């Protein structure tokens, strides 16, 4: 644990964001709690559990928690519309052939309506955000594709013999953030060119804005997570630790001015930053 803490300490050398406050969201803290996402406007958080079963909407203004779905698999890779009024999630089902499939569901959180928009999908990661979007990133079967104006383009900046995970499109849709298993985090242009290494321990990365990345730096003993810190990275190489060393802080999500994450103990926290 000491070695891991030293690694984080050495990385955290630059001032990128000012941490204004760190507060537990008690209404969003429960056994096995995990953050599934934060709305683009930062007004609510989606919660799930460690096995990604179900989604609950936690209103940051009122503290009210509302059940969206109890579906299995719903908490993995949730997509938001740009105004945050709609989300797209998966519900895992078993077909008559006894095989496992995903139904893709669109939920209107304002009208509290849901509809299945694709049935019996076998591609675990392929979700398309609702709304009028011309460029969409699809991270499926550890590969990346860009769908631009209806045309699907395969992208492999580090080659085809590696696994791509945690892929996301920058807010301005000009860059792709992704993690290559066993290698680290990278950013490239939407055509797959100009790949830039961000960091080996920049795991579960998320865009904070077009220039800053939020991630976790987790260290384990081969079996269990020992330490984990929420980090900020810039595209020009700066690194900052955002959480205290006594927290095992994991899987962050960010909106402008806010970072949310959960701990191994099921506590959910809101970091307000500027």
Language-model segments: which ranges?
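Sequence signature of WD/YWTD-type beta-propeller architectures
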Residues: 14-274
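N-terminal signal peptide c-region/cleavage motif recognized by signal peptidases
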Residues: 9-11
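Bacterial N-terminal signal peptides that target proteins for export
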Residues: 1-2
